[in-house]
């Protein structure tokens, strides 16, 4: 019904506007965008690596895989692992840039030491991995890569995980407070601002789980794979979970 002035009636004016539907993105365009990123390709290699390790761990049971199939899986695992090391140079530069950004724009609620642990430790690990890649690729003599250098890299990675977990716990707490504050202000759970904060919170929680899984795997490297952390099936499953979380995060961000 329309009033005499030609304007909609109050009942129709109070009718909420329908949310505009976002156009569906072409799947091939999305895949192209995903694979054009360094992290996208690295994620797929990571999934392949831990899937192969899980297959090898399961193949050790009964009945075992044929010897030829096991040899192919081991060769594939080794090749994929070497390929992933080539991506560590870009991640090293990313860690340096993250440290620079944190120095110019420090987080008000995160201690600088945690930032140094997270990005500095990851940077040291990725830097040392370049020597491992060059040695395994045959450019550097293997004797130039002592076991001590590998242990330094593993310890640096463990410190990076500790710093990253502490930072993400703070960020999760901030996002949870943000969601609660918006709800107390009267924003409904279906409001755009609450939905956006909830999506960010979910992704941050997934990143936190990934860091915890990765840190458990790194502890296994530090301790020499003793006890529960020595289970090949458990560690391969943990690595595959971490890889799938990476795929999900990067797929949604591109």
Curated annotation (Swiss-Prot):
List the ranges whose topology is Cytoplasmic.
1-113, 248-254
**Chain ranges on the Lumenal side, renumbered to this chain:** 135-227
Reply yes or no: does the keyword Ion transport apply. no
Q: Which GO cellular component terms are attached?
A: peroxisomal membrane
| Location in or out of the cell | Peroxisome membrane
Q: What does the record give under GO molecular function?
A: identical protein binding
- What UniProt keywords apply to this chain's record, in alphabetical order? Membrane, Peroxisome, Peroxisome biogenesis, Transmembrane, Transmembrane helix
Entry's Gene Ontology BP terms: peroxisome fission; regulation of peroxisome size
The membrane topology noted for this protein in its Swiss-Prot or TrEMBL record is: Multi-pass membrane protein
Is this entry keyworded Membrane? yes
Q: Where are the transmembrane segments?
A: 114-134, 228-247
Chief localisation class: membrane
Question: Main role?
Answer: Involved in peroxisomal proliferation.
Q: What PANTHER family does the entry give? A: PEROXIN 11, PEROXISOMAL BIOGENESIS FACTOR 11
Similarity annotation? Belongs to the peroxin-11 family.
Please identify the protein, giving its name as recorded: Peroxisomal membrane protein 11-2
User: What organism is this sequence from?
Assistant: Oryza sativa subsp. japonica
Gene, per the UniProt record: PEX11-2
């Amino acid at each position: 019904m329309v009033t005499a002035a030609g304007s909609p009636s109050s009942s129709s004016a109070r009718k909420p506007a329908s949310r505009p539907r976002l156009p569906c993105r072409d799947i091939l365009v999305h895949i192209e965008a995903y694979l054009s990123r360094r992290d996208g390709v690295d994620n797929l290699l990571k999934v392949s690596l831990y899937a192969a390790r899980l297959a090898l761990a399961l193949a050790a049971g009964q009945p075992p895989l044929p010897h030829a199939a096991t040899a192919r899986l081991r060769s594939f695992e080794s090749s994929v692992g070497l390929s992933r090391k080539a991506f560590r140079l870009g991640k090293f530069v990313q860690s340096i840039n993250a440290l620079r950004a944190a120095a110019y724009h420090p987080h008000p609620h995160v201690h600088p030491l945690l930032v140094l642990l997270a990005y500095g430790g990851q940077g040291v690990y990725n830097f040392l991995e370049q020597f491992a890649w060059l040695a395994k690729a045959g450019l550097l003599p293997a004797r130039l890569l002592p076991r001590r250098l590998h242990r330094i890299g593993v310890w640096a990675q463990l410190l990076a995980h500790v710093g990253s977990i502490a930072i993400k716990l703070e960020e999760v707490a901030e996002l949870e407070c943000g969601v609660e504050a918006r709800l107390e202000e009267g924003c409904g759970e279906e409001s755009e601002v609450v939905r956006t904060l909830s999506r960010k919170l979910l992704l941050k929680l997934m990143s936190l789980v990934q860091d915890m899984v990765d840190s458990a795997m790194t502890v296994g490297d530090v301790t020499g794979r003793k006890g529960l952390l020595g289970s090949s099936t458990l560690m391969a499953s943990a690595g595959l979970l971490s890889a799938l979380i990476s795929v999900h995060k990067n797929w949604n961000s591109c």
